[in-house]
Amino acid sequence: MKSSKNDTFVYRTWVKTLVVYFVMFVMSAVVPITAMFPNLGYPCYFNALVDYGALNLTNYNLAHHLTPTLYLEPPEMFVYITLVFIADCVAFIYYACGEVALIKARKKVSGLTDLSAWVSAVGSPTVLFLAILKLWSIQVFIQVLSYKHVFLSAFVYFLHFLASVLHACACVTRFSPVWVVKAQDNSIPQDTFLWWVVFYLKPVVTNLYLGCLALETLVFSLSVFLALGNSFYFMVGDMVLGAVNLFLILPIFWYILTEVWLASFMRHNFGFYCGMFIASIILILPLVRYEAVFVSAKLHTTVAINVAIIPILCSVAMLIRICRIFKSMRQGTDYVPVSETVELELESEPRPRPSRTPSPGRNRRRSSTSSSSSRSTRRQRPVSTQALVSSVLPMTTDSEEEIFP
């Protein structure tokens, strides 16, 4: 069966968007690599944004000068960029496999809307657009960091973080109800390459994106307070404590969102929790390296306690997720859409009608026709039948309860 014109249009739009995504991926791979080498057009090494040798938590920010606050050092920034690049490489392979799988699966289209359902299962054009926006914004972020514009870099990274949150939600939920997602998954032919891509490769890519989202939450928290600390007359220690507390609060909203909404679409979404553990290690490294600086400012204990709470909350949230997975497996409540047809057997006997007592005036007028109506009533017989009807049936009225020969 041929696909509908609407499905063909969706597929062509998806292919064109996929080409743009591939081009943007190549550019996002080139920009970080070239930015690490001197004499290639970048004025500064973007990883070395903050000089922790001049870190003083008791000072206030200095005008016309970059005041060092808590941020990623070159090793941590390199790890972050590398992990994001690995996730993008796996996503690149996934979408390439998805395109090949869709080309093969087009020969097995059995409905007018199957092709658009398969495109949405692999990754709709909206998901690809958000992925393109992520790749573009991370390039701009690296270029802005090379020029040491901390205010503009914080704004650009806010756009990148927002695109990452929307993209992660779109990968998990497809911005559709649960029953629509189930129907799209059920339309995929079993034991095909498309089946393997959607049900085995896509969860891996989604968890990698969720892990990168946890790291991006850390960078976003540090970028916000780096910009605030260099914009207003604040103490550096307050900015450090504010960055740690923001990174403590933001994941809590994601934990709640996961249990309330995202878990209905994807049970095994542990990528964010793994990313939070890695981000906690990255955050605690400056506290260990520059312990004397934090101790002299009397912030070592406070910052250490707040940083330690982050992996503890992550562990609690992950245990809740694991318990809910086992509970759902025991209950076995995995809902699927109803079949297209149902078999309905009509009742063999009609429903009893309420008796009506005629008035004396009406009895005289209808006396001439009573004998004929009684004979026609005796000729009526209930009929038992089986009908194959659609899953959505109209309500029957009283006049349709009896079937006349």
Swiss-Prot record:
Membrane topology classification: Multi-pass membrane protein
Topology Virion surface: residue spans: 39-76, 143-149, 216-245, 289-299
UniProt-listed InterPro entries: Herpes_glycop_M
Key word Transmembrane helix present: yes
Gene that this sequence comes from: gM
Annotated family: Belongs to the herpesviridae glycoprotein M family.
Main location (coarse class): virion
Compositionally skewed regions (Polar residues) per UniProt: 386-397
Positions of transmembrane segments: 18-38, 77-97, 122-142, 150-170, 193-215, 246-266, 268-288, 300-320
Protein name per the record: Envelope glycoprotein M
Keyword hit for Disulfide bond: yes
